[in-house]
């Protein structure tokens, strides 16, 4: 049945019920005590005024007024002590007719209706989509589900013309509540929505095997979450506006692990990096790299404490060797470079310049017994003639090839 046919049928039924009410008003007026006739006549006049124009787009608004007229009339009649049985009977029939009119007005009709951007087929009440229906858009999109007050509301399935599919809850025309969104490329989101955006708790499964499970806000990862990569690596921690930010833990597939601060999707701030081989770094991070002050502990017991740049010892730092040796000084790109002091476990020490991890250029070598010699060094070894200062005060020029370091 078409929309027009449904409308005509409904209007015919409305007219019949309105006629019933009018007839009962007239009969009630004839058979009521004289003191009620004026009241009944006044109510009938108001009733007729309201119902003279009962076009479909206006009639639903008149129902409330008609209900008010009937209820007021009924209350005033019932308060009259001289009311007779016939008056009661006709008033009861008027109220029943009004009940039928209300029921008819709220009863959904099945319609087929065209809109500016598509066609609707389904339940229709008071000139609005209400109940279950199907809407096929001119663009090729399709919605099948529940409507309320002319908007998608309740459970529904929306098929997009690009192949995406949403299946879940709606509120006031938008994704709201729990739903599943299947993307044409294979990605799937299952979780909570708010005003068309992922919001709340949800799981996003990527076609490449990655998966995120956690909190969302305004369509982006936000709050606590777990991201599992297809290679087995895993991040557990905080997100902000779609990126890792705050405290987090990253466990790499090869056994490495990071625990610490994140900013803008990168390791940044304070943190600890554990290597699978037993090495460990504690300190500052920037853009995923060791940068700033930190401590690197090797699995063999060696320890470096100092400044880092781009994952390397760079700046001022101290290196403690497991055998008791120690270096304090400048570093560049992971090697001793600049001024420094190297302490040997024997009690001797070297003070001077370093390059490429070795003493280079001017330097002084101090012996445990108080002697020292000054001169040039190359690749950590004395070269040329050195001046040797003895602990007893003697000074002499000595060929450096005779020195043992």
Each language-model region and where it sits:
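Short, surface-exposed secondary-structure junctions/capping segments
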Residues: 368, 387-396
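Long, low-complexity or tandemly repetitive, helically biased scaffold regions used
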Residues: 4-95
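Intrinsically disordered, low-complexity PEST-like regions enriched in Ser/Thr and acidic residues
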Residues: 92-118
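Serine/threonine-rich, low-complexity intrinsically disordered segments
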Residues: 4-5, 9, 23, 42, ...
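Residue-level structural signal for beta-strand termini and adjacent loop
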Residues: 135, 148, 181, 227, ...
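Acidic/polar residues in short coil/turn loops that connect beta-strands
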Residues: 116-117, 126, 139, 162, ...
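Conserved anchor residues at repeat-unit boundaries in beta-strand-based tandem repeats, strongest
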Residues: 99-103, 119-130, 142-153, 165-176, ...
């Amino acid at each position: 049945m078409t929309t027009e046919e449904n409308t005509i049928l409904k209007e015919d039924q409305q007219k019949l019920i309105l006629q019933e009410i009018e007839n009962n008003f007239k009969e009630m007026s004839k058979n009521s005590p004289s003191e009620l006739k004026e009241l009944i006549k006044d109510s009938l006049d108001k009733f007729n005024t309201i119902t003279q124009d009962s076009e479909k787009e206006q009639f639903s608004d008149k129902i409330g007024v008609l209900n008010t007229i009937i209820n007021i009339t009924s209350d005033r009649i019932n308060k009259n002590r001289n009311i007779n049985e016939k008056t009661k009977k006709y008033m009861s029939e008027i109220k029943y007719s009004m009940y039928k009119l209300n029921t008819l007005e709220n009863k959904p009709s099945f319609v087929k209706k065209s809109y500016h951007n598509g066609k609707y087929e389904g339940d229709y009440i008071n000139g609005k989509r209400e109940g279950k229906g199907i809407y096929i858009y001119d663009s090729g999109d399709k919605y099948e589900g529940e409507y309320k007050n002319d908007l998608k509301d309740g459970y529904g399935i929306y098929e997009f013309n690009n192949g995406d599919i949403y299946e879940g809850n709606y509120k006031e025309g938008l994704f709201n509540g729990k739903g599943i969104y299947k993307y044409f490329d294979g990605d799937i989101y299952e979780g909570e929505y708010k005003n068309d955006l992922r919001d709340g708790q949800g799981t996003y499964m990527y076609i490449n095997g990655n998966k995120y499970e956690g909190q969302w806000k305004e369509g982006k990862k936000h709050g606590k979450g777990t991201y599992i990569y297809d290679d087995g690596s895993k991040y557990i921690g905080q997100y902000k506006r779609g990126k890792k930010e705050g405290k987090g833990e990253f466990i790499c597939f090869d056994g490495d692990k990071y625990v610490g601060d994140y900013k803008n999707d990168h390791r940044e701030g304070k943190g600890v990096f554990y290597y699978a081989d037993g090495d460990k770094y504690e300190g500052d991070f920037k853009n995923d790299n060791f940068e700033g002050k930190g401590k690197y502990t090797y699995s063999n017991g060696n320890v470096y404490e100092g400044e880092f740049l781009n994952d390397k010892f760079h700046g001022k730092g101290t290196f403690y060797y497991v055998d008791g040796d120690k270096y304090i000084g400048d570093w560049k790109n992971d090697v001793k470079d600049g001024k420094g002091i190297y302490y040997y476990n024997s009690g001797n020490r070297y003070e001077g310049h370093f390059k490429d991890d070795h003493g280079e250029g001017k330097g002084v070598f101090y012996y445990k017994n108080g002697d020292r010699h000054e001169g040039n060094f190359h690749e950590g070894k004395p070269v040329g003639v050195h001046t040797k200062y003895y602990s007893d005060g003697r000074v002499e020029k000595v060929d450096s090839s005779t020195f043992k370091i």
